[in-house]
């Protein structure tokens, strides 16, 4: 929907589908994404990141996201703590992305959480 502060598209029906899955008996809501993408310079960039850049648009609150799927698996997020959610997301990140709990802690403690978009 946005790249940083630049608006790219509208919200569409994402919230309608998430709300329907959330409220229906036995319903399950999935966000399906590619784990990574190639940047213009050819480098691999993870789509699973520890933070989003300031000013980015967020369509759905985290409380509405039940599951996220990539080509490396499904992260079931319902009822989990923030740390458990992060660990579940790291588990479905691209294996070459360098995502790990220890790398995220290190980046956070050294204030090196630059998210290149």
Language-model features, listed with the residues they occupy:
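Conserved phosphate- and dinucleotide-binding cores of soluble alpha/beta proteins
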Residues: 1-117
């Amino acid at each position: 929907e946005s790249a940083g502060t630049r608006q790219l598209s509208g919200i569409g029906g994402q919230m309608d589908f998430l709300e329907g899955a959330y409220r229906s008996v036995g319903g399950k809501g999935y966000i399906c994404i590619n784990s990574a993408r190639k940047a213009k310079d050819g480098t691999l960039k993870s789509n699973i990141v520890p933070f989003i850049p300031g000013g980015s648009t967020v369509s759905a609150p985290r409380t509405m996201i039940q599951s996220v799927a990539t080509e490396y698996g499904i992260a079931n997020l319902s009822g989990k703590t923030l740390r458990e959610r992060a660990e579940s997301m790291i588990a479905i990140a691209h294996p070459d992305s360098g995502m790990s709990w220890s790398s995220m802690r290190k980046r956070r403690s050294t204030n090196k959480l630059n998210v290149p978009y």
